[in-house]
């Protein structure tokens, strides 16, 4: 039941986030990213030159006014926990502000870890109840987007909803990777199908389907009741998309929230930006898109900053080598602590402390932190994992057969290089 008598949107935008807690589901492995997630959870994967993927959901919370956040972790959580402790410990607990880490601990005397997204929330129910929130915002920690959750909260309250699901149109041939819904003219969800083999099209647009973004808002008491019921339901997989949302839809209690209503953009002429960087191609492309002249995702928007752990690094440096060749870059992102010596970097992303030695050409490549590229190397359409040392004279990305033998080459021709792969050469 809505307790706010004042329905003024500006007032609600201030009040509703204060009465809310956000739970970020950050335990996913991200297996489609191959060896990039062999030692880290997908939300902890580096993105955009200096960030981690989870920084986007966390920053959206703070910018939306939600300052009570739980992060639910499981798979390979050390890197993620370390990042949050170092970069997100500035909130004031005395003001009831926090980022609370909730690792899988078999808290309910069960013999299993988190079995599904709903089970991950259920196993922390005693902690979540103590937050004493009126609304619970469930978020995925592995997507790239900027969104004002307070606008979705207002939509949730104004509709009198028990559950609200954020949604956006996606190409129908890609929709089988998402939960897909059908809605009426008032955005009431009529049907919800999790990853259907034949996704239903949107009315009047046969090439598009309406997909769930994995973002849900629940009235807290209603959510707690649902979770209790789901845990005692035979055959349930204890997953929001597979079990809870279809059940709520059947009860006519789930509403859709179009992403266009809460998407944050500095250029309204650009389409709403949301990316599931779950494959190597998608991850590579989303990183390089940021180096374009006018990227769809504006990382320079002071009104909606993306926060992260900031290391005390010197500025990037471009120097000439002993022969006089100058280090130079074009259409690229180069982070602090990088040194490019007598080499050319084109349309690439260099994370902190990358060193590119003389006579190299780096083209359309993502270099994660602490990579060292030896002299006279050529790298094209690559993702080089953290702390890799590329031997002098190595060429990657020009010979598909050779790349497939030494490294991992995706169907789209993106080459992933890790330290383990290099150690076997």
UniProtKB/Swiss-Prot annotation:
Q: Which reaction does it catalyse?
A: alpha-D-glucose 1-phosphate + ATP + H(+) = ADP-alpha-D-glucose + diphosphate
Q: Mind telling me which InterPro entries this protein's record contains?
A: ADP-Glc_PPase, ADP_Glu_pyroP_CS, GlgC_bac, GlmU/GlgC-like_hexapep, NTP_transferase_dom, Nucleotide-diphossugar_trans, Trimer_LpxA-like_sf
Binding of alpha-D-glucose 1-phosphate, residues: 114, 179, 194-195, 212
Q: What is this protein called?
A: Glucose-1-phosphate adenylyltransferase
A molecular function (GO) held by this record is: ATP binding
- Per its database record, what is this protein's job? Involved in the biosynthesis of ADP-glucose, a building block required for the elongation reactions to produce glycogen. Catalyzes the reaction between ATP and alpha-D-glucose 1-phosphate (G1P) to produce pyrophosphate and ADP-Glc.
Which Pfam families would you find in this protein's record?
Hexapep_GlmU (PF24894), NTP_transferase (PF00483)
GO annotations under biological process?
Answer: glycogen biosynthetic process
Xref: HAMAP family: GlgC
Name of the coding gene: glgC
Which EC number(s) are documented for this chain?
2.7.7.27
The record's keywords, sorted A to Z, are:
ATP-binding, Carbohydrate metabolism, Glycogen biosynthesis, Glycogen metabolism, Nucleotide-binding, Nucleotidyltransferase, Transferase
Q: Where is the signal peptide?
A: none
Family as reported in the entry's similarity comment: Belongs to the bacterial/plant glucose-1-phosphate adenylyltransferase family.
User: PANTHER family under this entry?
Assistant: GLUCOSE-1-PHOSPHATE ADENYLYLTRANSFERASE, GLUCOSE-1-PHOSPHATE ADENYLYLTRANSFERASE-RELATED
Q: Kindly state the subunit structure of this protein.
A: Homotetramer.
The cross-references to SUPFAM superfamilies, in alphabetical order and at most eight, read: Nucleotide-diphospho-sugar transferases, Trimeric LpxA-like enzymes
Give the metabolic or biological pathway.
Glycan biosynthesis; glycogen biosynthesis
